[in-house]
Structure formats: structure tokens, C-alpha cells
Amino acid sequence: MAWCRATRSPSWQDSGMERVLGIGGYFMRAADPAALGVWYRDCLGLDADENGLWRQGTGPTVFATFESGTGYFGSRAQQTMLNFRVRDLDAMLTQLRAKGADVAAETQDMEGVGRFGWVTDPEGNRIELWQPA
């Protein structure tokens, strides 16, 4: 397997190197894909079409790596975590609780970054909700 050699300097800025433009999709396995799609639509308002295309609003996207032993994602079996930007975290968490979703009791504030809350989907995937600062 060939790996791209990592460098400490952002050499792509000066080299004319092609760059990715953004996240093009997020794909997950599910025991019942249709039901999980309905959950994301009904609980989070994710309006994807029949092909899964969802036109999201503008805003920042975070790409971060974590130590392999992190407990931040919930279950150790979960290798990635989906994060959605939200306008009003408290309103979203209230809405999710009203729909019977598994919402974590705690929230987290990060100065200059925003507020975070978490919900677990019916397949057991922990999802982070982020209200940017």
C-alpha cells in the first residue's frame, strides 16, 4: 500500500497542488437503511433526496483526527463521528428529546468555538451537534 508522505509545512500552498473542496458525502452501514434515513429526516431535519443528495447551508467544517483510544466518540467500535452544525443547540436537543431520541444529558461549551451536544441514532452511532460561536 502506498501512502502519501506527510510534511509539516503546508507545501500545497506554494506548489499548485490540487486540494479537496469539501466533504462530498458521509456513508454508513445500517441494519435498516430506510428506517435510519427516516430517523435523520424526522429527528434532525436532514432533507436528502432519493439519491441521498442533501444541500447543506454554508458554514465551517472541521476535519480533525483523534487518538485511537479516545472515548469522545462513545463506543470504541465507532471509528468516526458525524458532526452537524445547528442554529440553536438547546432548541435542537429539546426537539430530539420530544421525539424520543437518545440525547446525552451533558453539553459542552468551548470558548471561541461554540457549544456541543450529542445524540445517538437508532443504529447506535453517536452524533455531535455543534452551535458555532
Tell me the role of every PLM-derived stretch.
Residues 37-40, 93, 97:
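A generic alpha-helix structural signal
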Residues 34-35, 90-91, 114:
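Short alpha-helical
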Residues 2-28, 94-133:
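Vicinal oxygen chelate
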Residues 35-37, 81, 116:
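Secondary-structure boundary/capping motif
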Residues 17-23, 27-64:
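Core segments of cupin and vicinal oxygen chelate
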Residues 75-96:
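Mid-chain, well-packed structural core segment of small domains
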Residues 32, 88, 121:
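Acidic di-acidic motifs
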Residues 44-79, 119-122, 126-132:
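Conserved short beta-strand elements that form part of the metal-binding/catalytic scaffold
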